[in-house]
């Protein structure tokens, strides 16, 4: 398998982060509300993984190195895993598995609805991220996977609604996300491979 070392590094890194958070929770190092801290960190981790997934194509075009594309799907699946853990942690630590409380939460915190929409879209991408689905869906596969752009927008909106007044960190992620979207505009995307082939550029 090509780039196995890169795939292994992504696997170990993505696995180590939540494992470390769980260890911190075990030793009471996550503050007075470790459950909420875990929910927040898993959500932020999912957003970071989504941005990394979207960064792979521009990086490949700029560098010409195919290794970036080799881990793109893996990063996307880890993003889904983090979202699933984020949702599970919310149900356990915030709701306390009290499903009757969910209706109240939805009415008081509509950002949860935004997050759920993003989860449903990401679920569709996760279950179709395989060769069988690509063959079965044909040209519709690419159209379906453009949902990733909607997912990014929903993720940023979800985070904005959660942080509210503390916009400094959110702005950073929003700028990175907007930049990655700009790099996908046809007029810009066509120029990326040329940047590495210009005289004087190594």
From Swiss-Prot:
It is found in: Cell inner membrane. Coiled coil: none annotated. Binds 1 FMN per subunit. GO terms for biological process: protein repair. The chain crosses the membrane at residues 8-28, 42-62, 75-95, 110-130, 147-167, 169-189. InterPro entries: Fe3_Rdtase_TM_dom, MsrQ-like. One of its GO terms (molecular function) is FMN binding. Its cofactor is FMN; heme b. It is a multi-pass membrane protein. Its main location: membrane. Keywords: Cell inner membrane, Cell membrane, Electron transport, Flavoprotein, FMN, Heme, Iron, Membrane, Metal-binding, Transmembrane, Transmembrane helix, Transport. It comes from the Bacteria. GO terms for cellular component: plasma membrane. PANTHER family: PROTEIN-METHIONINE-SULFOXIDE REDUCTASE HEME-BINDING SUBUNIT MSRQ (PTHR36964:SF1). NCBIfam families: PRK05419.1-2. Heterodimer of a catalytic subunit (MsrP) and a heme-binding subunit (MsrQ). Part of the MsrPQ system that repairs oxidized periplasmic proteins containing methionine sulfoxide residues (Met-O), using respiratory chain electrons. Thus protects these proteins from oxidative-stress damage caused by reactive species of oxygen and chlorine generated by the host defense mechanisms. MsrPQ is essential for the maintenance of envelope integrity under bleach stress, rescuing a wide series of structurally unrelated periplasmic proteins from methionine oxidation. Belongs to the MsrQ family. This is Protein-methionine-sulfoxide reductase heme-binding subunit MsrQ.
């Amino acid at each position: 398998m090509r780039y196995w070392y890169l795939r292994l590094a992504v696997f170990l890194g993505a696995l180590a982060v939540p494992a470390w958070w769980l260890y911190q929770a075990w030793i009471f190092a996550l503050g007075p509300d470790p459950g909420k801290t875990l929910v927040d960190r898993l959500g932020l981790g999912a957003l970071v993984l989504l941005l990394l997934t979207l960064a792979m194509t521009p990086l490949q075009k700029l560098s010409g190195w195919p290794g970036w594309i080799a881990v793109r799907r893996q990063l996307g699946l880890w993003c889904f895993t983090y979202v699933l853990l984020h949702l599970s942690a919310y149900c356990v630590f915030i709701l306390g598995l009290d499903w009757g409380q969910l209706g109240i939460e939805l009415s008081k915190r509509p950002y949860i609805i935004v997050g759920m929409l993003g989860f449903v879209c990401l679920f569709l991408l996760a279950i179709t991220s395989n060769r069988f689905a690509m063959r079965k869906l044909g040209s519709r596969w690419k159209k379906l996977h453009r949902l990733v752009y909607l997912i990014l927008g929903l993720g940023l909106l979800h985070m904005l609604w959660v942080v509210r007044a503390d916009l400094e960190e959110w702005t950073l992620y929003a700028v990175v996300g907007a930049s990655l979207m700009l790099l996908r505009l046809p007029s810009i995307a066509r120029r990326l491979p040329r940047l590495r082939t210009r005289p004087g550029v190594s």
